[in-house]
Amino acid sequence: MLTCSDCSTWEQFVNYVKTRCSKTAFENWISPIQIIEETQEKIRLEVPNIFVQNYLLDNYKQDLCSFVPLDAQGEPALEFVVAEIKKAPAQPIAPREPQESPAETFEESKDFELKLNAAYRFDNFIEGPSNQFVKSAAVGIAGRPGRSYNPLFIHGGVGLGKTHLLHAVGHYVREHHKNLRVHCITTEAFINDLVQHLRLKSIDKMKNFYRSLDLLLVDDIQFLQNRQNFEEEFCNTFETLINLNKQIVITSDKPPGQLKLSERIIARMEWGLVAHVGIPDLETRVAILQHKAEQKGLHIPNEIAFYIADHIYGNVRQLEGAINKLTAYCRLFGKTLTESIVRDTLRELFRSPSKQKVSVESILKSVATVFQVKLQDLKGTSRSKELVLARQVAMYLAKTLITDSLVAIGSAFGKTHSTVLYACKTIEQKIEKDETLTRQISLCKNHIVG
């Protein structure tokens, strides 16, 4: 154990942490902790609330073991006392002060609000098969907040337009329902807001503020995972707003059922409508490229737009990054855009799955993403219609992209070579007539990571 003749072991720990975390984190989580008593066997600490206690143990347990006494199990020998809220002495009854209006509360509680991005509106959201449904749902709830799908839960990968739709809902409601209170916030900001009000002993004020909203927009709810106490407060706020028919829109990188949250909150999130934002298909990617290029004043011929879209397929942000890079190059060197310039400038962004790099596992992951099924189900034995089709597509892609024999491919899938052959013939017949399946297979190919 580290020792110091001039300060207690707890003070040593505090000084150590102070040099290794941000000023805000230190003031919110460490500074409020007061030492009550320190002996060779244990340390008694006063914490303002249970959240601070849990944060200390969750984030600094290993460091604590280097400074404070340990118990028989090798755990930090700490005893916590939650501070009592000191009541003010009784005062003579005075004339009642005017109650703070919801509008005043609203203005005072905007510290953590996420400003709506002026560029994120419905009219510049490029629509395609992968996002048509979720955009329609977002437009629907913006027109009738609290009366359509509540909550609206939007999930999908990074850079596919979830935040764009979230902010678009906020803009529309503010412009068409001017009397409604709108608040947009990230999950991290909600947690920081809660911590701040706990520290200031003004949690009721925060609760009143959130419960006075008509539309709550929450970005990246996945950051609520593994934060049980904060999750409980969010769930309480969530339920109150839903019961008052106030609209909630949530975004996440996963559907509710795949989040590591309590069954209670997952069930609440699945009450309304869960909508997926998928990877844009080729035509949508081309439309996005042309729209972004037009905004930048860059002329991009159709054939070059298709060339770029055929090589960049991960998400919209990558497409936007490509346009930014090409715009800068053409302006700096006074060049007109050509395929050669695109190839040289965007070499690092271009991806192309090769037969040598593609594995069965990467194919399965890609198919699971595009067909929106769980990877373990795809590897399982379920004979449901959607899983059978997804497995057949995976086998078809394996035969197309991997140089192994049918026997080896069948072995990788736990099937016989004849099953693989049947799957391939089935898919080949279907793609001649099924345009949607053809697009899905194209997306799978583009999404494969070696």
From Swiss-Prot:
Gene3D superfamilies: 1.10.1750.10, 1.10.8.60, 3.30.300.180, P-loop containing nucleotide triphosphate hydrolases. SUPFAM superfamilies: P-loop containing nucleoside triphosphate hydrolases (SSF52540), TrpR-like (SSF48295). Residues 85-114 are annotated as: Domain II. Its main location: cytoplasm. Residues 331-450 are annotated as: Domain IV, binds dsDNA. Keywords: ATP-binding, Cytoplasm, DNA replication, DNA-binding, Lipid-binding, Nucleotide-binding. It is found in: Cytoplasm. Plays an essential role in the initiation and regulation of chromosomal replication. ATP-DnaA binds to the origin of replication (oriC) to initiate formation of the DNA replication initiation complex once per cell cycle. Binds the DnaA box (a 9 base pair repeat at the origin) and separates the double-stranded (ds)DNA. Forms a right-handed helical filament on oriC DNA; dsDNA binds to the exterior of the filament while single-stranded (ss)DNA is stabiized in the filament's interior. Domain I is involved in oligomerization and binding regulators, domain II is flexibile and of varying length in different bacteria, domain III forms the AAA+ region, while domain IV binds dsDNA. NCBIfam families: DnaA. Belongs to the DnaA family. This is Chromosomal replication initiator protein DnaA 1. It comes from Chlamydia caviae (strain ATCC VR-813 / DSM 19441 / 03DC25 / GPIC). The gene is dnaA1.
